[in-house]
Amino acid sequence: MKENWVYRRGDLYLANLGVPVGSKQGGVRPVVVLQNDVGNYYAPTITIAPLTSKIEKKRKQPTHFFLRKAKGLAKPSMVLAEQLDTCDKICVIRYLGRVSKGQMRGIDEAVRIQLDYYIPEQSEKKRQGKCRKDGEEGDG
């Protein structure tokens, strides 16, 4: 049945992340799919971030994103973007729901901070004004 599922970026699933080691999240818990939909279709794995319902701890950590409500979550949860993981699709137990577009933007922001892909808004505005035209070479 899982082979017939269509995994989409922003979907929430219940997954078995295995035995936790040290501070790494494990066990059966909600996860949010971060991988692009092309990869979700073809790959036997999905890139995810685990969620926790222990929302009091390190709530202001920039790699955490608070989900007060999300379609399919029973209680408020925290996305732990510092614990990005690749999960085999056979570890996915069931579909829970989906985060909103606004929530996904917040999760993306936390992931960018975790991976140091963070572009401050000022720099991003400058970059948008200097878009290359089709056929132009970039500087890297």
Language-model segment annotations:
Residues 1-140:
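Conserved functional hotspots at enzyme active or ligand-binding sites that engage polyanionic ligands
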